[in-house]
Amino acid sequence: MDGVFKMIDIHLLDIDNDQPRKSVSLVELEELSISIKENGILQPLIVCKANDRYKIIVGERRFRAAKLIQLTNIPVIEVDIKESCKDFMPLVENIQRENFTPVEEAYAYKNIMNKYSLTQKDLSEKIGKSRTYISNLVRILDLEQEILNAIHRKEISFGHAKVILSLKDRQDRYNLYLIILKKKFSVRDAEKYVKNFSKSIVKKRELEQDPFLNNIKEFLFDKIQTKIDIKGNQNKGKIEIEYFTAGDLKRIVSLFGHSS
């Protein structure tokens, strides 16, 4: 956001009472005031001119903390901001400042994009986060409400949610969610599960889509009476024959004319 940097008297600053805002805890303000006392205000407040005074657009917490330590002059960037966009920056600041859960943050970004007709790219440029981050975050809203509730309650993490979303089928997603809860899967465990699950799905689909290989598999099973796995296609691949005991192995090889 373009603007003019200046130092102004703190008494000329006013809080915008129209800003949507949750209460600011005294503990947070005291911690911030200590930081300001030691290091100064590292990031100027964003303000706009209102008659002979200035209205705070972004930086209310810094303003309040500065007042706690009786700071007299404060760094600001004065901007000329359209009336229709005045509430945009405070909304974004609130989201980034508060300890939102991923679900709350996702809903907030989605609402902002809808309200201001922004694309994910537009929003990413305005708030300094990557488009991929926003995309992944908003995507979790596609999950079932039960899963969203679990994320909100911190029973599963945002990382878990991204892994669940890697599955296309909703029933598969829900099953993975239940497994994560039951087996207390870490994100890495969930990723391994999806990798193995995806391999089995691909293998199953290959056979389903190739009647010739499926017929071969059924023929071999009838002849050998054990688990058969065919990997590949009609031109190249491999056949795996499983045995479960020494006797089973002898029985299978004897079918090919081997005698022990």
UniProtKB/Swiss-Prot annotation:
GO terms for molecular function: DNA binding. The keyword DNA-binding applies. The keyword DNA-binding applies. GO terms for cellular component: chromosome. One of its GO terms (biological process) is positive regulation of sporulation resulting in formation of a cellular spore. Keywords: Chromosome partition, DNA-binding. It holds the Pfam family ParBc. PANTHER family: CHROMOSOME-PARTITIONING PROTEIN PARB-RELATED. Involved in chromosome partition. Localize to both poles of the predivisional cell following completion of DNA replication. Binds to the DNA origin of replication. Belongs to the ParB family. This is Probable chromosome-partitioning protein ParB. It comes from Borreliella burgdorferi (strain ATCC 35210 / DSM 4680 / CIP 102532 / B31) (Borrelia burgdorferi). The gene is parB.
